[in-house]
């Protein structure tokens, strides 16, 4: 039975967020709703979740001893990773000593890099995936491309938001693709995955919750990617009953194999009735921000409810909804937002993340819309996002 203490009191229930971006901010808010003491950690100060947490710490989370020292200092009841770039071996050791890691330290370790989760999915669980090879050197990379064939995709085994990722159409792109992959890894230069191109009709994120009362599925989320990062997402994505059944079967296998309780973002390719596994995040997914307006329980509320050991019950989806990102390009440490009257209204909401600075292109907010159709919801969200004026 779950018992929650009161924040800032001796019996407080403490949650430590490792990673304090916009997704962590929403998780922190859901924890605050339940009176949970929230500690936000990231590699830079004033990150979004730090602005709504009880305490904040700035450390290099890839440095195992620094991470261990902070955890031993704060003594959280739950450690909740929000990003991949964490010293996961340290989390495994701490979990073995009794520390609770959400959903499990093994899940964090396997999904920290694309190799761990790809080998689990393709080789252990025998799920359908794209063809793939791994490489440690430029010579090995070129050999992998020859094996896979063109066109293909190369990604650092550890990166996010499209960093270091290239779509290779011809052999004269290989040197630049290798160089970019070595620059884009979250933990520095190193191993890459070369993937064959999958012919698909659309991509989905199947938000899957593993909780004390079983495995639950949100309605499938469709999304559009550009430069490796999402631009719009919508719910529900229309798909055949057979494809949805297959998608749920794949997602169930993956989350049960990873173990623990929480919400998982399972990314899948859909072609007709066929479904191919792509990736999984053992935490809320950026494309799932649409659930802030589309469901009675957002992906963040579901994640917190699940890892606290509370039942999820039924998830109510309200109908066609969409999100669109606010993605300006500028350099500033004093960003302001204008023309906001065009970004809010009936069935139209706005979230600004509070990121302290921007240097280039950065996702600073999202608009959320509901409508009578998915197409109309996407159009409303995109129009609202485009109307916001970002200055600094």
UniProtKB/Swiss-Prot annotation:
A GO BP annotation: 'de novo' IMP biosynthetic process
Domain ATP-grasp: 119-308
Enzyme class, UniProt record, top EC level: ligase
Cellular component aspect of the GO annotation: cytosol
Chain sites annotated for binding ATP: 114, 155, 160-165, 195-198, 203
Key words, A-Z: ATP-binding, Ligase, Magnesium, Metal-binding, Nucleotide-binding, Purine biosynthesis
Catalysed reaction, written as an equation: N(1)-(5-phospho-beta-D-ribosyl)glycinamide + formate + ATP = N(2)-formyl-N(1)-(5-phospho-beta-D-ribosyl)glycinamide + ADP + phosphate + H(+)
Binding annotation for Mg(2+): 267, 279
Residues where N(1)-(5-phospho-beta-D-ribosyl)glycinamide binds: 22-23, 82, 286, 355, 362-363
Single GO term (MF): phosphoribosylglycinamide formyltransferase activity
Pathways involved: Purine metabolism; IMP biosynthesis via de novo pathway; N(2)-formyl-N(1)-(5-phospho-D-ribosyl)glycinamide from N(1)-(5-phospho-D-ribosyl)glycinamide (formate route): step 1/1
Enzyme Commission (EC) number: 6.3.1.21
Quaternary structure and interacting proteins, as annotated: Homodimer.
Function: Involved in the de novo purine biosynthesis. Catalyzes the transfer of formate to 5-phospho-ribosyl-glycinamide (GAR), producing 5-phospho-ribosyl-N-formylglycinamide (FGAR). Formate is provided by PurU via hydrolysis of 10-formyl-tetrahydrofolate.
Family affiliation: Belongs to the PurK/PurT family.
Protein name: Formate-dependent phosphoribosylglycinamide formyltransferase
Source organism of the structure: Klebsiella pneumoniae (strain 342)
């Amino acid at each position: 039975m779950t018992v929650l203490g009161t924040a800032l009191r001796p019996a407080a229930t403490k949650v430590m967020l490792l990673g304090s971006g916009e997704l962590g901010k929403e998780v922190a808010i859901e924890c605050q709703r339940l009176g949970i003491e929230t500690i936000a950690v990231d590699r830079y100060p004033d990150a979004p979740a730090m602005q709504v947490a009880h305490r904040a710490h700035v450390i290099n989370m890839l440095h195992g001893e620094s991470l261990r020292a902070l955890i031993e200092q704060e003594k959280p009841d739950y450690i909740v990773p929000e990003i991949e770039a964490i010293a996961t071996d340290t989390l495994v050791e701490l979990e073995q000593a009794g520390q609770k890691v959400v959903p499990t330290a093994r899940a964090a370790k396997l999904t920290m890099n694309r190799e761990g989760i790809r080998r689990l999915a393709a080789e252990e669980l025998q799920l359908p995936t794209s063809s793939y090879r791994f490489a440690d050197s430029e010579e090995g990379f070129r050999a992998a491309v020859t094996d896979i064939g063109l066109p293909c995709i190369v990604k650092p085994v550890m990166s996010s938001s499209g960093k270091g990722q290239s779509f290779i159409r011809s052999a004269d792109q290989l040197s630049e693709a290798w160089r970019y992959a070595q620059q884009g890894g979250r933990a520095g230069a190193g191993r890459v995955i070369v993937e064959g191109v999958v012919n698909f009709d659309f991509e989905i994120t199947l938000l899957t919750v593993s909780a004390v009362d079983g495995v639950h599925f949100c309605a499938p989320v469709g999304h559009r990617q550009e430069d490796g990062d999402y631009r719009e997402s919508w719910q529900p994505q229309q798909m055949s009953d057979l494809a949805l059944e297959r998608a749920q079967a794949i997602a169930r296998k993956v989350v049960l194999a990873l173990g623990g309780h929480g919400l998982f973002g399972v990314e899948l390719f859909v072609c007709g009735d066929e479904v191919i596994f792509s990736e999984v995040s053992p935490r809320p997914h950026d494309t799932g921000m649409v659930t802030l307006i589309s469901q009675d329980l957002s992906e963040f509320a579901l994640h917190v409810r699940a890892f606290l050991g509370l039942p999820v019950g039924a998830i109510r989806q309200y109908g066609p909804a969409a999100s669109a990102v606010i993605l300006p390009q500028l350099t500033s440490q004093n960003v302001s937002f204008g023309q906001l009257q065009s970004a809010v209204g009936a069935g139209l909401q706005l979230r600004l993340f509070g990121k302290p600075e921007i240097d280039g292109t950065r996702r600073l907010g999202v608009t959320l819309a509901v409508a009578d159709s998915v197409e109309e919801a996407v159009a409303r969200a995109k129009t609202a996002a485009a109307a916001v004026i970002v200055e600094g």
